[in-house]
Amino acid sequence: MKKSPLPVQNVQSSDKNVAGKEALVKLLRWHFGHADFRGKQLEAIQAVVSGRDCFCLMPTGGGKSICYQIPALAKPGIVLVVSPLIALMENQVMALKEKGIAAEYLSSTQATHVKNKIHEDLDSGKPSVRLLYVTPELIATKGFMLKLRKLHSRGLLNLIAIDEAHCISSWGHDFRPSYRQLSTLRDSLADVPVLALTATAAPKVQKDVIDSLNLRNPLVLKSSFNRPNIFYEVRYKDLLDNAYTDLGNLLKSCGNICAIIYCLERTTCDDLSVHLSSIGISSAAYHAGLNSKMRSTVLDDWLSSKKQIIVATVAFGMGIDKKDVRMVCHFNIPKSMESFYQESGRAGRDQLPSRSVLYYGVDDRKKMEYLLRNSENKKSSSSKKPTSDFEQIVTYCEGSGCRRKKILESFGEEFPVQQCKKTCDACKHPNQVAHCLEELMTTASRRHNSSRIFITSSNNKTNEGQYSEFWNRNEDGSNSNEEISDSDDATEAANSVTGPKLSKKLGLDEKLVLLEQAEEKYYERNKQVKKSEKNAISEALRDSSKQRLLDALTRVLQLLACVEEIDSQKGSEFLENECYRKYSKAGKSFYYSQIASTVRWLGTASRDELMTRLSSVVSLAREQEPLEEPLLATEPVENIEEEDDGKTNTVESRVDEPTQELVVSPILSPIRLPQVPSFSEFVNRRKIKQNTLIDKSSEGFDDKKPAKIMKLQ
């Protein structure tokens, strides 16, 4: 029910009393139902209401939105809120409207008539909207900036609040170039106070945000980063028999809780979700590889508690306000302490006891290092996130000290270990953690012939030639196809064969010689390091790929309600054979990438697309249907005689034995094609054939026939 605006009017009756604590608390209780302000909320509100710039650093769940929602009620006019995500704007506007507060948002997803209605209200003599949420991209447009200037000239723009302000800094873990353009707000709207809010910002990020926004003598407020209601724990994959099983047992032991599981790769999200569902845990995968309709369904099911667990890439979570999340699990190591803190902080927003669990694996660490190094090489000029930031989270996992202390120290906050009060595994079970670290050291030394497992030992090339498909924030934002970073071996192979730039002036024979030499050099180098064996596609890999496709196809068939029309087993075998035929000679990396691409295609395919691609399997299933009915007869067959060229073959069935059900399945014998010769083999065979023909022609043919044969050849 819409609340009466009387308390707001009473507060506005006296400008002197607008920033008073009593009036502000009255607004808080009336509109939001809270007894009092928390942390630095009151100081931030009083600063911006009095017209002063403010930089406010509050932990996730600390109530940052109150800092600009109360000022919108305390004074007439409009508060402009800049938000990075449309989902965040939608959620907050919906919540405010339910409380009777006039709020709107402008985005590209809205219908034209809705946007026109909002613009008409802004142009009216007395706009009804109190909070207007916009994206940084909209502010960058000339038309909207002109509208803001008009509102300002009419005295209707009270405050500019920039949520998730760390996005403006290239030092931050969530840098967005569009945020960088917000510095123009100070030039155009000089006397409007600016409130910058963030939950995660290291000291260098804080300074960068303040400088970039041109904040003038801002009040800098920093709440403690400590989340005392969260228990921090690290589990070591290298010491577990099966990380999937361990996670499943952990979730079962916690009961029917709401949780988020973050994964580095989309395929891991799919596989882990299937595993959890198979053991009776209600879960769903969420990532940009799914179409928008499926993502929306999964999100709604999780928010409404129809789904217990959501397994997602790290793009998920910003702007999602679900207070009863009891556990956040990182199934792969995050890229920085900032990322880990923000993501784990999505647990326990209701201040009730919650849990953060990080599954640490040496191989996962190597993958993340590989990703960060590639990112630095590609974006050395714009990206300021060196691998040194990654060292903090590695130390968090590989160190034996208090986890909470390491988190807070990374943000420049001193924290006595005694205050942890056994709210992390290192303080609660120090001997057990120390034993695990010793065992991890031994295991890593045995596997990698090195006694060092810290990041400084990562410069070796142990992960070369491995396939990987890393999550990319930009790709998730644009819903584009995911890139697969193929192995260095595959790239080298392509460069080796196609490396020589063949001039058009060269003759055919010279080009053939150059290509032949390049190929021989490549294959000779491969023989030396045995890369050909390393890159071979084993039967075990094919079996695991079939199982992966089977799981994905089964899930999609259930969603599309076409289980009866397509045999999931035969469909998965068909798709795997398709990938194997195309990429068996290219090697394991290309083959596995194609399998991953097929799994992602299954997640986005429509019913018609699925039926078209698997048409042979569908038609095969339909052909088999009429054959199955007669075979279910239970009457025994006595004697069947067949005559063939005068010979009688008798097929007897014993009446006293139970009749076995006959199953007729088409024999799909694989078509064995001749092996494709390499380029060198092809050239050599060609020369041998030419020499043979010349020898034969010299025995009994005249001089013209060899030339004719060669011409035909």
UniProtKB/Swiss-Prot annotation:
Tissue specificity note: Expressed in roots, seedlings, young leaves, shoots, shoot apical mersitem, inflorescences, flowers, siliques and seeds.
Catalysis performed (reactions): Couples ATP hydrolysis with the unwinding of duplex DNA by translocating in the 3'-5' direction; ATP + H2O = ADP + phosphate + H(+)
Region (Disordered): 465-499, 638-657, 694-713
GO molecular function: 3'-5' DNA helicase activity; ATP binding; ATP hydrolysis activity; DNA/DNA annealing activity; four-way junction helicase activity; helicase activity; metal ion binding
UniProt record, GO biological process: DNA recombination
EC number assigned by the record: 5.6.2.4
Record keywords: ATP-binding, Coiled coil, DNA-binding, Helicase, Hydrolase, Isomerase, Magnesium, Manganese, Metal-binding, Nucleotide-binding, Nucleus
Residues engaged in binding ATP: 58-65
Domain of life: Eukaryota
Biased composition (Basic and acidic residues): 696-706
Transmembrane segments: none
Helicase ATP-binding domain boundaries: 45-219
Sequence motif: DEAH box, positions: 163-166
GO cellular component: nucleus
SMART domains reported in the protein's UniProt record: DEXDc, HELICc
Entry-linked InterPro entries: DEAD/DEAH_box_helicase_dom (IPR011545), DNA_helicase_ATP-dep_RecQ (IPR004589), Helicase_ATP-bd (IPR014001), Helicase_C-like (IPR001650), P-loop_NTPase (IPR027417), RecQ_Zn-bd (IPR032284)
UniProt cross-references to CDD domains, sorted A to Z: DEXHc_RecQ, SF2_C_RecQ
Pfam family, one: Helicase_C
Cofactor(s) of this protein: Mg(2+); Mn(2+)
Positions in coiled-coil regions: 508-543
Top enzyme class: isomerase
Domain Helicase C-terminal: 246-391
Chief location of this protein within or outside the cell: nucleus
PANTHER family, sorted: ATP-DEPENDENT DNA HELICASE Q-LIKE 3, DNA HELICASE RECQ FAMILY MEMBER
The family this protein is said to belong to: Belongs to the helicase family. RecQ subfamily.
Protein name (Swiss-Prot/TrEMBL): ATP-dependent DNA helicase Q-like 3
Species, as recorded: Arabidopsis thaliana
